Amino acid sequence: MAAALAATATGCVPYPVYKTMQPAARVTVMDTQSQPLSDARVVLISSSYPYGRERSRQEARTMPTGKATFSAQTEWRVESLMLHGSEIYFWNWCIEKAGYETYETLNNTASQFDDTLIVQLPPGESRSCNRP
């Protein structure tokens, strides 16, 4: 009983929560003529607050149709209410293909993420989606 009261007083109350670490998502990659680009490297980057750290990267190659798909990753967790809040996930895309400009998003909230992205890559220099 004393431990429960102490936890409540400090704000560290554990509670169950169902977290989406990575949403189900799909990308269609095309050139500027709206033709599908196959074998483009698509990276779905999962990060979380309160620290803004990258948590994981999932990669896929586009099919001849220019499409790549990602499955959702979810789990039940026990979190504690802390001063900085709970862990909140957000996601970004990085898409690269030799001979085309790299596409990259810099989202910092989940609401900014497009889980049905259609992107056109202009010709140009490609940068790697590998971590800096």
Predicted ranges, named:
Residues A6, T10-A24, T28-Q35, V43, ...:
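Beta-strand-rich domain onsets/edges
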Residues P14-P16, R57-R61, L81-M82, T105-T109:
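Beta-strand-rich interaction surfaces with strong enrichment in secreted/lumenal proteins
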Residues P16-K19, P50-Y51, L81-G85:
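Short consensus segments that form the blades of beta-propeller domains
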Residues M21-Q22, E54, E87-Y89:
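Residue-level preference for beta-strand/loop junctions
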Residues Q33-Y49, P64:
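Short, ordered, surface-exposed loop/turn motifs in non-cytosolic proteins
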Residues P50-W76:
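Short, acidic Ser/Thr/Gly-rich low-complexity loop/linker segments typical of extracellular
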Residues W76-T109:
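A short, solvent-exposed loop/turn motif at the edges and junctions
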